[in-house]
Amino acid sequence: MDDTSQRDNIYAAPHDNVGEFIFDKKVVDVFPDMIKRSVPGYSTIIHMIGQMAERYAKADSTCYDLGCSLGAATLAMRHRISAAGVSIVGVDNSSDMIERAKQVIDADSYDVPVTLRCEDINQTPISNASVVVLNFTLQFIPKQQRQSLLANIYAGMNQGGILILSEKLTFEDAHHDELVTDLHHYFKKTNGYSELEIAQKRTAIENVLVPETLTTHKNRLTEVGFRSVDLWFQCFNFASIVAFK
């Protein structure tokens, strides 16, 4: 956790009405703790995003972190990119997230230029991109908008550029889906979340975060035009794909 982060207890007490999950200041204040205790493998994914950016960011190009939240992937890229003339654009539609992310970026001493924008990533112009990151972001975009978003990203990428897509997955095999869901819930329990917290968070987020199968993601990326689509990380029902233009 960073110095401004608190422990996530948003759903620790019973809620008479569990509303939809939103990325407001209440979530921003506990977000690093929430992610660490809720998403298995998150720190590994962030570290490897930095490493892949170091490998594939080209001189005088732009890297995008779409749905950047507090800038974890942005910082991972910033700390590893060595190519000259590279800049990073971080985008999030939560003003609370962007406000806090600016504080995080301003406190960082690395010199790769970073621009943060508060806007809908469906409206973000993509150009001259060598690396684009969607780190647990697409799952919050309405299904009917996902194809057009990826098509817009693809169109703005340079040949040889990469898209890193991390997502929570669902599985066609009911037994496997039940198994990994149970293992994920146990992961959260071992990290200190109560059954009440897990149940209320699930209620809040079930119509906000809409997961899809790995096959669906791969097919969509191929349909958009990516020439190579590969799974590079998976832990339970959390995975990350790298797609090459």
From Swiss-Prot:
Binding site for S-adenosyl-L-methionine: Y42, G67, C68, S69, D92, N93, D120, I121, N135, R202
A biological process from GO: tRNA wobble uridine modification
Catalysed conversion reaction: prephenate + S-adenosyl-L-methionine = carboxy-S-adenosyl-L-methionine + 3-phenylpyruvate + H2O
Documented EC number(s): 2.1.3.-
Membrane-traversing stretches: none
Molecular functions per Gene Ontology: carboxyl- or carbamoyltransferase activity; S-adenosyl-L-methionine binding
Keyword entries, A-Z: S-adenosyl-L-methionine, Transferase
Family: Belongs to the class I-like SAM-binding methyltransferase superfamily. Cx-SAM synthase family.
PANTHER family: CARBOXY-S-ADENOSYL-L-METHIONINE SYNTHASE, TRANS-ACONITATE 2-METHYLTRANSFERASE-RELATED
UniProt function note: Catalyzes the conversion of S-adenosyl-L-methionine (SAM) to carboxy-S-adenosyl-L-methionine (Cx-SAM).
Subunit text: Homodimer.
Record's protein name: Carboxy-S-adenosyl-L-methionine synthase
Lineage: Bacteria, Pseudomonadati, Pseudomonadota, Gammaproteobacteria, Cellvibrionales
Gene name, Swiss-Prot/TrEMBL: cmoA
